[in-house]
Swiss-Prot record:
GO terms for cellular component: cytoplasm. Belongs to the class-II pyridine nucleotide-disulfide oxidoreductase family. Its cofactor is FAD. The keyword NADP applies. It comes from the Bacteria. It is found in: Cytoplasm. Binds 1 FAD per subunit. Keywords: Cytoplasm, Disulfide bond, FAD, Flavoprotein, NADP, Oxidoreductase, Redox-active center. FAD binds at residues 36-43, 278-287. It comes from Mycoplasmopsis pulmonis (strain UAB CTIP). InterPro entries: FAD/NAD-bd_sf, FAD/NAD-binding_dom, Ferredoxin-NADP_redctase_2, Pyr_nucl-diS_OxRdtase_2_AS. Disulfide bonds join 138-141. Homodimer. This is Thioredoxin reductase.
Length: 307
């Protein structure tokens, strides 16, 4: 990519919202590029199954991600692999993205769609030492590499329950550690998890320590005030997410909590910069709401940018 080229639209991210926006802008004949440093699809690639996408009773997250990605490219949107580290608001109709490798991408408008990243339970003793040596964040991606060894899932929400259920088809035993006295996940998901014979749920529990020589071998868990030793080879935390748009701090669009406020057209307080998906301040974060955001931003930009 030439650094002298100016795109009509640059989209930061490659999740459902980003790819939907790319479909609309490229289909509207806007020169579009989307940038991400992970596999296209965003959190879709971590979902073993999706049951609330209209038209598909059940669909694998990876399959849906591929369909989104191919659809966006079919109309000419270009994919750039890279990590955005700075967003510069040069003027209302010119923005510059700086990538980690020093490359710069300029565009008339920018859509921020970088979503959120997993929250890490760093209060667990030795947690950092076992990242990538037992601690992982994607059951679908990494679960198989730990074989049939017992595993821990931390969390009581939808993601924890879904991934725990999926992991039970790989690991010989799955311990689901829930801080509270009950799940907050949807009932249908909880019922599916409870039907698995090799899943044990520990309520009112928290992981305190991780131990092992070269890789994770066991965890110390506080359960109802008593310490329990669980011999496991892997641990997957699903305890919430944090906003992922630090690169936009110099552009003046971030709120104190790290999220971004927009109007009904997905535009931020800075002209020409839009935000969609999970990074927006909103109450409901779902695949459908992200695609809705992407649709709105894509249509608005198609109408506003004159070719």
């Amino acid at each position: 990519m030439s650094q002298n080229k100016i795109y009509d639209v640059a989209i930061i991210g490659a999740g459902p919202g980003a790819l939907t926006a790319a479909i609309y802008t490229s289909r509207g004949n806007l020169d579009t590029v989307f940038i991400d440093n992970a596999a296209p699809g965003g959190k879709l690639i971590y979902a073993s199954k999706i049951e609330n996408w209209p038209g598909d009773t059940i669909v694998k997250g990876t399959d849906l991600a591929i369909r989104f990605f191919e659809h966006a490219q079919a109309f000419g949107a270009k994919y750039e692999y890279g990590k955005v580290v700075d967003l510069i608001n040069i003027k209302d109709d010119l923005k510059e993205l700086v990538l980690e490798d020093g490359k710069k991408i300029q565009a008339k408008s920018v859509i921020i769609a970088s979503g959120m990243v997993s929250r890490k339970p760093r209060e667990i003793l030795n947690y950092d030492e076992f990242e990538n040596r037992g601690v992982s964040y994607c059951v679908i991606c990494d679960g198989p590499m730990y074989g049939h060894n017992p595993a821990i899932i931390i969390g009581g929400g939808n993601s924890a329950v879904e991934e725990g259920t999926f992991l039970s088809s790989i690991a010989s035993k799955v311990y689901v550690i829930v801080r509270d006295s009950d799940f907050i996940a949807e009932k249908a998901l909880v019922n599916d998890l409870k039907s698995r014979k090799n899943i044990e749920v520990l309520f009112n529990a928290s992981v305190k320590e991780l131990h092992g020589k070269d890789a994770l071998e066991y965890a110390i868990v506080n359960h109802n005030g008593k310490e329990v030793k669980l011999e496991v080879a892997s641990l997957f935390p699903y305890i919430g997410f944090l906003p992922s748009a630090e690169y936009a701090k110099n552009a003046g669009v971030l709120e104190p909590n790290g999220f971004i406020k927009t109007d009904e057209f997905m535009e931020t307080k800075v002209p020409g910069i839009y935000a969609i998906g999970d990074i927006r301040i909103k109450d409901i974060r779902q695949i459908l709401t992200a695609t809705s955001d992407g649709t709105i931003a894509g249509k608005i930009l198609t109408n506003r940018i004159k070719k």
